[in-house]
Amino acid sequence: MTAALLESQLHSLPLLARGKVRDNYAVGTDRILMVASDRLSAFDVIMGEGIPGKGELLTRVALYWFDRLGHIVPNHLTGADPVSVVAPDEVDQVRGRSMLVKRLKPLPVEAVVRGYLAGSGWKEYQETRSVCGVALPSGLTNAARLPAPIFTPATKAEMGDHDINISFERMSEIIGADLAERVRAISIQLYSSAAEIALSKGIIIADTKFEFGLDEDGTLTLMDEVLTPDSSRYWPIEHYQSAYAQGRNPPSFDKQFVRDWLESVRIDGQPWNKQAPAPALPDDVIVHTAATYREALERLTA
């Protein structure tokens, strides 16, 4: 098994921040080098082991979607080769897993679009028959396809905390009504276009999370990762009907296998408390998870 890149170490650029997956470096005052590591987090805890090749796979998926959806909204890509801004001895850490992007002013909200009822949306629906203030028909079950995609924003949490679902009205208070309307309309258009493309490749995109920023001219710009298995719920179409009939989610092209293993593992006879440090991931879990991410990319680009 090839080694995972848990952390990039670039000496030629100043480090801005390390997130759950990405290491961001300043390139002058107007650009950022985003390096996607092989780190993996579950339950908001970063695992001690990485998934070899995950960062490159995520980057390739994001670039695929930026290309397919570029007609809808501008994105943060500069078009420049990330390798061009690092020292020769750093190229191997950067090639294939990085994006050189514009430095933007991020909007302080996550733009979540749901086409199916799952996860926190399903939980909220059971209690209120709505999700983030969006009323839904009675009688829906887990993994049900919604009559139309819905926009359910969330506030961005600090690393280690959960994002908090908010109403559209609250989002309008945070960023302004006009900008909120634009973000909602563009997010639904992005999701709808991507969902149609993915369906033709045998993938259901149940839900996804977009991030936007403003450039120096105030132009709304799509940023960060887009429609990757880390920011979206990807379901294989061939397993959907049987899972839906049983009221459960289909297996997904992401880290769900890791989450399931963590839920089942016992430490001194007790379940893991979902606090750092996480239990060490066995090799078979790592290999299976890497293959799952790879299959998502291969289906999309076939």
Swiss-Prot record:
Enzyme class, spelled out: ligase
Q: Where is the signal peptide?
A: none
**Top-rank taxon:** Bacteria
Q: Which PROSITE patterns match?
A: SAICAR_SYNTHETASE_1, SAICAR_SYNTHETASE_2
A single GO BP annotation from the record?
Answer: 'de novo' IMP biosynthetic process
Under which EC number(s) is this enzyme classified? 6.3.2.6
Which pathway does this polypeptide act in?
Purine metabolism; IMP biosynthesis via de novo pathway; 5-amino-1-(5-phospho-D-ribosyl)imidazole-4-carboxamide from 5-amino-1-(5-phospho-D-ribosyl)imidazole-4-carboxylate: step 1/2
Reaction(s) catalysed by this chain's protein: 5-amino-1-(5-phospho-D-ribosyl)imidazole-4-carboxylate + L-aspartate + ATP = (2S)-2-[5-amino-1-(5-phospho-beta-D-ribosyl)imidazole-4-carboxamido]succinate + ADP + phosphate + 2 H(+)
**Keyword tags:** ATP-binding, Ligase, Nucleotide-binding, Purine biosynthesis
CDD domains of this UniProt entry?
SAICAR_synt_Sc (cd01414)
Question: What are the record's GO terms for cellular component?
Answer: cytoplasm
Q: Which HAMAP family match?
A: SAICAR_synth
Q: What is this protein called?
A: Phosphoribosylaminoimidazole-succinocarboxamide synthase
From which source organism is this entry?
A: Leptothrix cholodnii (strain ATCC 51168 / LMG 8142 / SP-6)
Which gene name belongs to this protein? purC
